[in-house]
Regions:
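Basic, polar low-complexity surface loops/patches
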Residues: 1-191
């Protein structure tokens, strides 16, 4: 039971929360939206982040032996909430129920069916009106810079001589997301 649930009680975790933790552990850099009936729910730290970001009421999921923070959004309003979260820079893992509840033998099976990030959107309802670039930066003999709009397939790439030219291009294209080469991720002066 990870600390991410921020729960209290002697345990054990109820099966629903065990399933949540198993999926959440596979996508540690994402906010997991976990379908429970007509809602996408978050638990623990994710619930606190969701409630804070969207101004939602933070409640608690309580079972006989365990209590954890909980917040959720109605599935019917998913596009509007997802758009807001993506604009704030969140990466979303969407876990849907993949079998009807009435046909489930025990716990309803859930699987992550979508991974959404600001730069990889293809859903028409979530796309911004302007280009939605995913940028990638690498170093070598200068600065390698590539832009991809996955919704249209547009691709641009260039090699730049200076860091200021790199920043100028980033400012001009305003990417929704930037991927850094490993050596740049560890360079605090760059990030």
């Amino acid at each position: 039971m990870g600390n991410m649930l921020k729960g209290e009680g002697p345990g054990p975790l109820p099966p629903l929360l065990q399933q949540y933790v198993e999926l959440r552990d596979r996508y540690p850099d994402y906010l997991l939206l976990f379908q429970v009936g007509d809602f996408y729910e978050c638990f623990g730290e994710d619930a606190e982040r969701l409630a804070r970001a969207l101004g939602l009421v933070l409640t608690h999921k309580t079972s006989k032996d365990f209590t954890t923070p909980m917040a959720g959004i109605p599935i019917r309003a998913f596009d509007a909430y997802a758009e807001r979260l993506l604009k704030m820079g969140f990466r979303l893992a969407v876990a849907d129920q993949v079998e009807p509840a009435e046909e489930a033998e025990g716990l309803v099976r859930r699987e992550v069916t979508q991974l959404l990030t600001p730069g990889t959107l293809t859903q028409e309802a979530l796309l911004p009106r302007e280009a939605n670039y995913l940028a990638a930066i690498a170093t070598g003999d200068g600065w390698g810079l590539a832009f991809l709009d996955v919704s249209t397939g547009e691709f641009k790439g260039t090699l730049l001589k200076s860091k200021s030219a790199l920043y100028d291009e980033l400012f001009r294209h305003r990417p929704a997301e930037v991927l850094l080469a490993p050596e740049l991720r560890e360079n605090e002066a760059f990030v």
